[in-house]
């Protein structure tokens, strides 16, 4: 199995191509079972964050961004004020799932900023923009993790050249399942494999 094939199997958070649901790995079943679940409702998304079905700050942020985009796509009507009012209710509801999750609030606030910065646009365009913003959040996380990996791999190569013993010690949730891809502390190993 190549590194890319591995990543395809363990993408923690992704939106289904048809945008009908948020697709996550249910991390409460790990390590014994890798099971993907689809989240369609505000209750399912809230519960997945609350019950740690999705774990790791970056992964929670991506789940929140995709979750609010999915929920906003179902808001009826084409009047901005009514749309924004309902968006805020949904945002606040998702935010209540994990009161200490910094990336949860960061992602939801960023999504809200995208809505308010585009209030002159029609609601359909704003809904599309929210999916694009969620994609950006996920892609930025991938690039951050990759950057960590490249720097870390460079340091590991230097240690190896010096003949020093190499070890990687992680704490908390620092692997690929905590992020959109690569992980944080584990990223240098994946970059090395690439």
Model-based region annotation:
Residues 53-63, 67-194:
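N-terminal active-site beta-alpha-beta segment that forms phosphate/nucleotide-binding
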Residues 1-43, 47:
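Positively charged, low-complexity intrinsically disordered leader regions
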